[in-house]
Regions:
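Activation targets extended, charge/polar-rich intrinsically disordered C-terminal tails
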Residues: 42-57, 180-444
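Bacterial N-terminal signal peptides that target proteins for export
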Residues: 16-29
Length: 444
């Protein structure tokens, strides 16, 4: 299901009971409340230059990283497999973890750190998605960055009947949905002449795997170390365990537990920002729930634009203060890049004029301005420019280094702050040297 709008992505349903209809009307009412509370819906269509990161180079410098992606609605043409109603302009979100792998013999979505050497980590990761179809899991996992985003398409190949079928066949061979059960209400929409397994993979393509076949995406990377990736893996496995054991049944909810809650809270587990609780009272959740495109902007700002030159501002940010004192880490750091990719073209299966909205205040809102800035200023999308920017920021901080005249905890914070900045300055300068060396070798 696509976030925000709550529009289903299954076949047209048979007649429902009065009880089910009333339940759906209540769900619709909750969504209307949310829309009223967040009145501005802006920038529906893809408006960003296509950007790409050199995966081999990036992973050689940052073998462990998380990548949050806000992805558009999809619009499937009729006559190709199951006729799906489609999502809505609120879109969907997915989460890629480089350096984490699916445990292949678990028979259920379970993660572990990859065994690969950090030097061979390019594309070695797992993509996660949340879907309202699921009954016994919160998320599913797709092995490999290339397949998670691009399916089984060859370089330069469009989406056609052959590549569409090939991608589903490969997904089945990988066992992406092994051990996963769908809600009966979803399975009841299955065409009579289709097996449940084929149906599950058909309605999951371009939402839970092979995202680029049908959707535009805007992605934000968060460099991590092995320890932080391990924390995220443990968090995600623990999140799924009650559904795996049968203690709980998963029920997606646009306001209280949508696709973006998973990614937000996984990043909160390592200190990127505050946790966003699930299952809050509806009147509270309706005015504060994650919207995929908003989350993309929020994450890019958190990892690039915190006032790191102002230690007092960092001290007043509780999450940043705790991160720095306990971990020696500031979430705004080098290497946190954005990437924009439109849906694959040519495309015989899906229309590619797609929407993905912000929710924002219509007069005083700033999301559009902030989004535009990300794709105008090279430091957000180009690795060398990003690293040079942080090197300059760190140099300026250290040049003005002055400890406050205090003996309280703020003084301890200041000392830790300058130590961290000095360490990060040395690291980013070393990374720039490695990047320059890599570019020189590539040019030969």
């Amino acid at each position: 299901m696509d976030a925000v709008t709550g529009m289903r992505m299954t076949t047209i349903r048979p007649a429902e009971s009065d009880t089910k209809i009333l339940h759906r009307l209540r769900q619709l009412a909750f969504v209307v409340i949310a829309v009223i509370g967040l009145p501005g819906c802006i920038n529906a269509y893809y408006q960003a230059p296509r950007t790409a990161v050199d995966e081999r180079v990036y992973a050689s410098l940052y073998p462990y990283f998380a990548e949050y992606c806000a992805v558009s609605e999809f619009d499937k043409k009729q006559g190709f497999g199951v006729d799906i109603e489609g999502g809505g302009p609120g879109g969907h979100s997915v989460f890629y973890l480089n350096g984490a792998c699916r445990v292949r013999d678990a028979g259920f979505p379970v993660l572990a750190l990859c065994d690969d050497s950090p030097n061979g980590m390019a594309g070695r990761g797992v993509g996660l998605s949340v879907n309202d179809h699921y009954e016994n899991t919160n998320w599913t996992a797709t092995e490999g960055r290339a397949f998670f985003y691009h399916g089984a398409l060859a370089p330069g190949e469009g989406v056609n009947r052959a590549s569409y079928a090939r991608t589903q066949d490969e997904a089945k061979a990988m066992g992406i949905l092994d051990g996963v059960k769908f809600h009966r209400a979803t399975l009841d929409t299955k065409p009579a002449d289709m097996s449940e397994r084929d149906f599950m993979y058909e309605v999951s393509i371009a939402t839970d795997y092979a995202i680029d076949l049908a959707r535009d995406r805007f992605c934000a990377r968060v460099p991590l170390d092995r320890g932080k990736m391990e924390i995220i893996v443990r968090y995600l496995n623990a999140l799924n365990e009650p559904y795996r054991s049968g203690q709980k049944e998963f029920h997606w909810n646009v306001l209280r537990e949508n696709c973006a809650h998973l990614e937000h809270n996984a990043l909160a587990a390592v200190g990127v920002w505050r946790e966003l609780p699930i299952d809050r009272p509806l009147l509270i959740a309706a005015f504060d729930f994650p919207v995929p495109k908003n989350e993309f902007v929020n994450l890019m700002r958190r990892t690039n634009d915190m006032p790191i030159a102002d230690p007092d501002a960092l001290y007043d940010d509780e999450v940043a203060r705790v991160d720095l004192l306990r971990q020696g880490w500031i979430a705004t750091e080098p290497g946190a890049l954005a990437e924009a990719r439109p849906a694959v073209q040519p495309n015989d299966i899906y229309n590619t004029h797609l929407r993905l909205i912000f929710y924002d205040e219509p007069v005083f809102g700033h999301y559009q301005q902030r989004f535009d800035r990300i794709f105008v200023e090279p430091r957000y999308t180009d690795l060398a420019t990003n690293l040079a920017h942080f090197s300059q920021v760190y140099t300026a901080i250290l040049a003005k280094r002055q400890m406050p005249d205090t003996t309280d905890r703020r003084g301890d914070f200041y000392q830790r702050y300058f130590d961290v900045v000095a360490r990060e300055k040395a690291k980013v300068d070393a990374t720039l040297v490695r990047l320059s060396s890599s570019a020189s070798w590539s040019a030969l």
